[in-house]
Amino acid sequence: MALWRGSAYAGFLALAVGCVFLLEPQLPGSALRSLWSSLQLGPAPAPPGVGSPEGRLAAAWDALIVRPARRWRRVAVGVNACVDVVLSGVKLLQALGLSPGNGKDHSELHSRNDLEEAFVHFMGKGAAAERFFSDKETFHDIAQVASEFPEAQHYVGGNAALIGQKFAANSDLKVLLCGPVGPKLHELLDDNVFVPPESLQEVDEFHLILEYQAGEEWDQLKAPHANRFIFSHDLSNGAMNMLEVFVSSLEEFQPDLVVLSGLHMMEGQSKEFQRKRLLEVVTSISDIPTGVPVHLELASMTNKELMSTIVHQQVFPAVTSLGLNEQELLFLSQSASGPHSSLSSWNGVPDVGVVSDILFWILKEHGKSESRASDLSRIHFHTLAYHILATVDGHWANQLAAVAAGARVAATQACATETIDTRRVSLKAPHEFMTSRLEAGSRVVLNPNEPVVEWHREGVSFHFTPVLVCKDPVRTVGLGDAISAEGLFYSEVHPHL
């Protein structure tokens, strides 16, 4: 009986300690281990997530992410900036009296019906997209409903402003932002962001961000992933009005890194305007002192001719680095007749070998080489499940840390946490993959303890890492911009650039 009673007491105490452990995981591990061992019940259980693949991967990243030897001091960013009005896409469309019909992509939106069809199309795929709304009055009516929506939130928007805001979080960096900055945006910007007076305007540019969650339903429609649909009637950014202000500000600011974005905003313009403006973009970039790297951040596009012109009309050779996602990468290949261009869209997680082939083609056909007058030597690719940094050998350093840092910020920003909470993230990357689909690539099996995989192909180095995908993302907008900014922050360019 005494033996039974002692066993029962030990059992109850073990149960109690287990409950304490589950309910109060923040208690010091030493206190829990001491209590557990005093009961002589063997080794204490590991805290949640520590031994999981997600926990091991997060710990491995932390060990790999180190600042480069040579760091940026002054970063200039331009030229698109706006105020993002973020709210539930389904709730807004319901408030507008719309119902989900058959989804259909529209390269440009002209009506509420076009908006409903395009939103349904992309929500059904769980894919991000950005479209221009041509009707000024209809857009302002929708924008007013969205802005006054009880759950609507206002944030810094526009790739340039978001990238500048991310850089500004580092107090040892000085950040210049050129773009159409109205009163609301100026109020939202970090104090560390300097806006030249010529960039200030009386009225803000508003972009509407319609978000949806993974598994969210609207009648028969169900989103496979959390994502967003963006639309605007943005004339200032659409004309890249701040380009000349941006370039003229560089001489006084003396940056050692320039980040350019906003080319996609020209989709609502005429072909003649696009061609003329792109030539002016190239001329402006050529005025930037030699040795100052220029990163171009691409964004969602539907105009193949505009994308083809960006690729071929000297824009790619003029920049040093590119940032883009899976939609932009495939569209780029389709527009310029690159590899796998017959692929109409991605089916689920983009195939690593296919992505690698397209990145290799961009750098081989349009990148820096002895026989080509091009500065392009780096591409930072990001998709929901993984990231790849591809670089021409001999021009960039610390890319292992850079790709890991970009993936880490994707997890923390999506979940709105300071550090990775392993209970709120999961691995979505393929467990194994081929490094190429066109050549005899290697087969790679993921190891969470060594999360960055490196391979080489004819003078191009690839750094791959999976992403810890947030299960319940708080905000998806600006993730790509944060990823690119963080990757650049940890990158080092060789002086002979």
Curated annotation (Swiss-Prot):
Q: Which species? A: Bos taurus (Bovine)
Q: Which GO terms describe its cellular component?
A: endoplasmic reticulum; extracellular region
A molecular function GO annotation: metal ion binding
Pathway field: Carbohydrate degradation; glycolysis
Q: Where located?
A: Secreted
Q: Which residues does the entry assign to the active site, renumbered to this chain?
A: D481 (proton acceptor)
Top-rank taxon: Eukaryota
Identify this protein by name.
Answer: ADP-dependent glucokinase
Which UniProt key words apply to this protein?
Answer: Glycolysis, Kinase, Magnesium, Metal-binding, Secreted, Signal, Transferase
